[in-house]
């Protein structure tokens, strides 16, 4: 007998009007194309103040969290998301909240995370209890997804202003900038939790930050939310301009502290929010601009949503005008369905929420009849034969329908979910699949009776017969290659020769190398491995030769072996299995003896 579960109530956002109505308010898409919208990138909670970080082949996105039904900036915690393809985002929950800082009382507002010294530092503005004014704290973690802890037990900066951003220059000097109505900076020490000297106010001149009219006390366009970075020798300060409502402007300089020159508008006044907040990165050969608006049901100035656009710098380094869209950034590569995928990795979700899972990480919960998850660009290759899911239910469960192209598209499988005796009492269920081939948008549609049906932790497809689901590592894996055991010699006078391993018929792989970043004395490369054969790969191995004296210092999404200038990168535990026609990537950092990276011709072989 299952105990009667307590009622589970969805938040106000998910009980709101259909998302399409709200999206069309900021879009010129026709109804036929609007169904493919991927902005805002999070739909089950309100998010604001995006701060992206590129680390080990993924984008980690740190956001604020607007509470449902807010009539002010009611924010109690911060959230983390990550993606390798810019469209399917994994929810990592809330590793930092006001309660992390014993000295803070309210207002978990816009912050930023930077990586240094093997750690991750999160700079955030909060209200200090002792002064009842805004101060900037710093939290630290060993992982980009936390958990974070208060690094110093007190404010780092406490002059009543907000919106910290941190930039580390090429010489290793780190700068903390912040401010509204002023713009300040300090030089951080190498420990990233203290600074030298005193805070310096950056002159807000009209030449540096544009001209505002009608407000004698604030003659420039600068409002708040600075985002400072360097690209190709140019220092950029992108900021929220001239409230209210705000647009995004930017200035450039030849040094990290100015003098700044105003360059114009990045994003015009758009969307249903009177604020905006920028975040800019380069990732996987492209440039991306993050922002927020009020596009979700019930959205507005106090209930915002983070979105992203891909853009290209002008040839002279200036930033083009970027408009809000509902289509968002294009997908990078495809998602591998044959490795375990978290249920909370989502391109678009309807009706669902997430919560911490007893097995670690997060799970999708509060699932009701008709809710669904969209996972974009799933590379099925020649076809999946079965599907497994990790589920839990304190009621009688329901069904996971596997559909292609839309929530009502072709059904390729249907998995029954039983009652398991509790919302965190997990069980793995499996079902056959037929017709899932090529690259498809996968819709996991949930059906059943009334009320909450079940929770959903992870899923995995199998190709060519039923296999045991394999574990997926955390978003920043550090795979350790299994050493090859030393064989024991056979004590016979004439040992039997060991046969040369042969590759099964139909197995083949191809690889391309792309240089995605360069600097004096080094470069970053990306290896794209594709199953070019007719049957699934169980693993792959890439080899290439560097010029004499050059070495690879780091690899992610793979395991590294070096012998002299001969480099071998093998698959990690989670990305070796590739269906025909599907791809995966591995990245590496290498030294370079010249200003231009060497020409590398890698080869790939099945493992």
PLM feature spans:
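Secreted/extracellular small peptides and ectodomain modules produced from precursors
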Residues: 14-17, 413, 507, 602
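Extracellular low-complexity, O-glycosylation-prone Ser/Thr/Pro/Gly-rich "stalks"
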Residues: 80, 320-325, 329-341, 346-348, ...
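C-terminal region of N-terminal signal peptides and the immediate post-cleavage residues
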Residues: 26-38, 462-468, 501
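Short, basic/low-complexity N-terminal boundary segments at the transition from targeting/disordered tails
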Residues: 19, 140-142, 602
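Secretory targeting and sorting signals
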Residues: 2-36
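Extreme N-terminus of proteins, especially the signal/transit-peptide cleavage junction
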Residues: 8-11, 34-38, 43-44, 502-508
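Carbohydrate-active catalytic/glycan-binding domains of CAZyme proteins
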Residues: 36-413, 421-465
């Amino acid at each position: 007998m299952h105990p009667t579960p307590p009622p589970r109530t969805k938040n106000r956002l998910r009980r709101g009007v259909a998302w399409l109505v709200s999206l069309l308010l900021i879009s010129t898409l026709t109804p036929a194309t609007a169904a493919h919208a991927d902005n805002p990138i999070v739909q089950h909670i309100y998010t604001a103040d995006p701060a992206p970080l590129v680390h080990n082949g993924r984008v980690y996105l740190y956001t604020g969290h607007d509470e449902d039904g807010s009539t002010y900036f009611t924010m109690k915690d911060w959230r983390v998301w990550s993606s390798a393809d810019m469209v399917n985002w994994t929810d990592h929950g809330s590793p930092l909240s006001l309660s992390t800082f014993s000295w803070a009382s309210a207002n978990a507002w816009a912050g930023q995370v930077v990586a240094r010294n093997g750690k991750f530092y999160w700079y955030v503005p909060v209200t200090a209890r002792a002064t009842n004014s805004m101060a900037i704290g710093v939290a630290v973690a060993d992982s980009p997804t936390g958990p974070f802890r208060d690094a110093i037990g007190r404010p780092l900066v406490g002059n009543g202003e907000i919106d910290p951003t941190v930039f580390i220059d090429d010489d290793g000097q780190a700068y903390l900038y912040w401010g509204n109505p002023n713009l300040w900076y300090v030089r951080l020490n190498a420990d990233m939790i203290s600074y030298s000297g005193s805070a310096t106010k950056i002159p807000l001149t009209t030449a540096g930050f544009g001209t505002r009219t009608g407000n004698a006390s604030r003659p420039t366009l600068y409002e708040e939310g600075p985002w400072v970075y360097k690209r190709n020798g140019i220092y950029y300060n992108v900021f929220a301009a001239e409230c209210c409502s705000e647009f995004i402007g930017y200035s450039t300089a030849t040094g990290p502290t100015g003098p700044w020159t105003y360059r114009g508008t990045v994003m015009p006044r758009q969307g249903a929010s009177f604020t905006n907040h920028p975040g800019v990165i380069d990732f996987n050969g492209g440039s991306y601009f993050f922002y927020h608006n009020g596009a979700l049901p019930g959205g507005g100035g106090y209930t915002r949503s983070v979105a992203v656009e891909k853009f290209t710098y002008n040839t002279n380094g200036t930033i083009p005008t970027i408009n809000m869209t509902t289509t968002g950034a294009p997908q990078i590569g495809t998602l591998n369905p044959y490795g375990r995928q978290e249920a909370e990795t989502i391109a678009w979700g309807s009706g669902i929420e997430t919560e911490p899972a007893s097995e670690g990480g997060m799970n999708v919960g509060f699932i009701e009849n008709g809710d669904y998850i969209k996972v974009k660009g799933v590379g099925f290759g020649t076809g999946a034969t079965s599907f497994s899911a990790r589920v839990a239910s304190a009621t009688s469960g329901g069904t996971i329908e596997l559909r292609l192209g839309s929530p009502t598209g072709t059904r390729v499988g249907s998995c029954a979910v039983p009652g398991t005796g509790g919302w965190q009492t997990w069980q793995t269920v499996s079902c056959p699949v037929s017709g899932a081939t090529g690259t498809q948008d996968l819709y996991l549609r949930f059906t059943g009776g009334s009320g909450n049906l079940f929770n959903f932790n992870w899923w995995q497809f199998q190709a060519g017969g039923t296999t045991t689901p394999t574990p997926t590592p955390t978003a920043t894996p550090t795979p350790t290659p299994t050493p090859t055991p030393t064989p024991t010699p056979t004590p016979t006078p004439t040992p039997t020769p060991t046969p040369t391993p042969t590759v099964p018929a139909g197995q083949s792989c191809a690889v391309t190398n792309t240089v995605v970043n360069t600097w004096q004395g080094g470069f970053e490369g990306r290896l794209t491995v594709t199953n070019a054969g007719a049957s699934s790969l169980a693993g792959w191995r890439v080899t290439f030769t560097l010029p004499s004296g050059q070495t690879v210092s780091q690899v992610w999404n793979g395991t590294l072996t070096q012998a002299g200038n001969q480099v071998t990168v093998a698959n990690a535990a989670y990305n070796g299995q590739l269906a025909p026609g599907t791809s995966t990537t591995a990245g590496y950092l290498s030294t370079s003896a010249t200003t231009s990276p060497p020409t590398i011709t890698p080869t790939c072989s099945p493992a």
